Curated annotation (Swiss-Prot):
This is Arsenate reductase. InterPro entries: Arsenate_reductase_ArsC, Ptyr_pPase, Ptyr_pPase_sf. It comes from the Bacteria. CDD domains: LMWP_ArsC. One of its GO terms (molecular function) is protein tyrosine phosphatase activity. Its main location: cytoplasm. HAMAP family: Arsenate_reduct. It comes from Bacillus cereus (strain AH187). Catalyzes the reduction of arsenate [As(V)] to arsenite [As(III)]. NCBIfam families: arsC_pI258_fam (TIGR02691), PRK13530.1 (NF010053). The gene is arsC. Belongs to the low molecular weight phosphotyrosine protein phosphatase family. Thioredoxin-coupled ArsC subfamily.
């Protein structure tokens, strides 16, 4: 069944938040959605994001850090920006793209507990979306 919708998680560096969101998205939405993530820049997958997801038995070592792909962006059924208010640069999207904003703090460079907190918050948000469509 290839009539899947496409969801595209975006943040600044495609290093932490959008990587975790992609993994949670594949877990909770993978049956009905093609799940992608990207950033304005590609900073590489943060080792602590990999470690945090491993704690919940999700392996993201094969995910790549990617710059926003206009083809995916323009055909996505839903674009989700994950930047916090503290981020000065959050990806902009074309006006015709269905975009929502789910803001999460950037754990990069912070305490380990921040990675765990943000991981859990993103997981809960995507789980709720999978159950309610909102």
């Amino acid at each position: 069944m290839e009539n899947k919708k496409t969801i595209y998680f975006l943040c600044t560096g495609n290093s932490c938040r959008s990587q975790m969101a992609e993994a949670w998205g594949k877990k909770y939405l993978g049956d009905n959605w093609n799940v992608y993530s990207a950033g304005i820049e590609a900073h590489g997958v943060n080792p602590n994001a990999i470690k945090a997801m491993n704690e919940v038995n999700i392996d993201i070592t094969n995910q790549t850090s990617d710059i926003i792909d206009a083809n995916i962006l323009n055909r996505a059924d839903l674009v989700v920006t994950l930047c916090s208010h503290a981020d000065s640069v959050c990806p902009s999207t074309p006006p015709d793209v269905n975009r929502v904003h789910w803001g999460f703090d950037d754990p990069a460079g912070k305490e380990w507990s921040e990675f765990q907190r943000v991981r859990d918050e993103i997981g809960e948000r995507i789980k709720r979306f999978s159950e309610t469509g909102e």
